[in-house]
Amino acid sequence: METNVKGEKDKELELNEVTMILDVAAGVIEKVRTGEITHITTVLNDDNQNQILENADGALLLTIEELPDTYHGCYLYNGGEFPYAIKGSLEYLVLNDGEGQSLTKIIGVGMEPVKRFRFQGPDEPSVEDPEGDSCIWEIQFEVAPVLEEPRHYLMRWNPSVSSFKEEDYQACLEDMNHGMFRLNWSISEWQEARRGDVFYMLRSGDEKAGIVFSGMFISDPYPADDWAGTTKRRMYVDMVCMNAAAPDEEPFIPLEKLQKAIPAFEWAKGHSGVLLPDSVWQQLSELWEY
């Protein structure tokens, strides 16, 4: 499957096996954009199994040690434990409501058996059975909108003073889901921030200073208690974090390189969650892609 969908401003995203197109009802796209809808569900079947599940030339890969006596295709119940692997390359859903399309980023996947039946062999009719060895699996994609014109923010992290320590970062990397982990983070210039905006995380305060991961906001800003323990309130955003450098590795873009390539911006000092000017984030994105 190949499609071109508008992503960042004036940029065509060429998507093939990393995306899947799903038809949705009218109004769903707008509700995904606002966050009223966060999950898109579909049932696993013979038509979409190769798009959703890891497979080798169409043969589904099972994640269980004990194989069933008969072939169930994508309908194996396995005691209610999902026996397949979600395709690691599947990153996006394109939502189609009949009038337009919208690109969304997959940020989580859930699976649930919704109807059980008894497998009677190839070419034999299936019989619905609450104790059956087969089932229809519902796949729940958690998504966030990929905006055509996202704003770009610089978040800052100093492990020596932050409540988020280096060991917390390591734990996040060891517990990633679908290649991502989640954080909430304070944002100083929050007034224009919205769900779907892009961020870069700048580590500071030590010899590993530089951009260490990127991601997107999956909430609008909201108030909460100060992470530093003061009585004042701060604004925060929820984020999914991707493309992360290990704590013992060099940052993807060292601070010295940032300062040399984009000297007009103050990288070494400042608050977390500052809105980057267009000229700055465009240069930064070129460094990131390079």
Where are these regions (language model features)?
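Short, charged beta-turn/beta-strand-edge "cap" motif at the junction between a beta-strand
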Residues: 98-100, 203-208
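Compositionally biased, charged N-terminal/linker segments
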Residues: 2-88, 97, 118-123, 127-195, ...
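Eukaryotic short linear interaction motifs
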Residues: 162-164, 208, 223-225
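Short, flexible loop/turn elements at secondary-structure junctions
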Residues: 159, 203-205, 219-221
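Polybasic, glycine- and aromatic-enriched phosphate-binding surface used to engage nucleic acids
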Residues: 189-204, 223
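Aromatic- and Lys/Arg-enriched surface recognition patch
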Residues: 82-146, 212, 216-280, 289-290
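His/acidic/aromatic-lined binding-pocket segments of jelly-roll/cupin-type domains
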Residues: 191, 209, 215
